């Protein structure tokens, strides 16, 4: 277990941030920043508003030897019950904006909320991104995981990704970035920070776009736990196909293992969609992790298939 940050480290960090005029908050409950509504108190959350402030913040972290993690929309994340051995970086300001460029191109900041952002873009009469209006979280997180559903993936639309790596800002096309099903190279690079993207869409018929938005929203609501505290799909589909071409889904394997509705503390494997774990009470990260490990073990024992987590862990989780 990592040691907590010292009071001197925290006090010095706050003084440095104040003198640099970089926004931050103290003693932040991370559960309120998570769709799971799980997570403890972080000593400092730093909220840089532009690229220069991000670079300066990282310089401060490295100079002071302060461990840090970046947090986005918190929608596909399980946050530690005790996030007190690091500080959190959370982009703000210009990173929360998107703008139309020309010819169907949009520049989208990494801290934009995917659901309203891509709904607004679609309602401007541009088609191709309707599926993203059903995915919660922030655009930066969607980039990192190559988020997708209903046959579409974010990288199908991306023209360029702007990101920070090793204190340098890069702009790369999808062909220059390793990516695949719910995967990009950024997943394994904890020090890389997505700053924004440019996407290209086609003009479409607004009435058809509105219908598409509604159909996808209704489809999502009918197949997933509604108004429940969760982090979305817990496991990736294993990409295994039957002889008839039907894809085996993670939820089917979990159901086959007899785990639908299983409860640990305040967490439950959803009776409605068993690839979801929901917070039905005062669930802890430890409760959720117990169910995650249970699913991994039981599915392997039952089917011989090893599932891979889709949700990310944020901090130490026993």
Swiss-Prot record:
Broad class of enzyme this protein falls into: oxidoreductase
Compartmental location: Cytoplasm
Organism domain of life: Bacteria
Main location: cytoplasm
Location of the active site: 182, 233, 310
PROSITE patterns: FAD_PCMH
Keywords, sorted A to Z: Cell cycle, Cell division, Cell shape, Cell wall biogenesis/degradation, Cytoplasm, FAD, Flavoprotein, NADP, Oxidoreductase, Peptidoglycan synthesis
Coiled-coil ranges per UniProt: none
Cofactor list: FAD
InterPro entries: FAD-bd_PCMH, FAD-bd_PCMH-like_sf, FAD-bd_PCMH_sub1, FAD-bd_PCMH_sub2, MurB, MurB_C, MurB_C_sf, Oxid_FAD_bind_N
Gene Ontology cellular component list: cytosol
Region (Disordered) residue spans: 212-232
Pathway entry: Cell wall biogenesis; peptidoglycan biosynthesis
Composition bias type Basic and acidic residues, residue spans: 213-229
GO BP annotation list: cell division; cell wall organization; peptidoglycan biosynthetic process; regulation of cell shape
GO MF annotation list: FAD binding; UDP-N-acetylmuramate dehydrogenase activity
Catalyzed chemical reaction(s): UDP-N-acetyl-alpha-D-muramate + NADP(+) = UDP-N-acetyl-3-O-(1-carboxyvinyl)-alpha-D-glucosamine + NADPH + H(+)
Family: Belongs to the MurB family.
Entry-linked HAMAP family: MurB (MF_00037)
UniProt cross-references to PANTHER family, sorted A to Z: UDP-N-ACETYLENOLPYRUVOYLGLUCOSAMINE REDUCTASE
Protein name (record): UDP-N-acetylenolpyruvoylglucosamine reductase
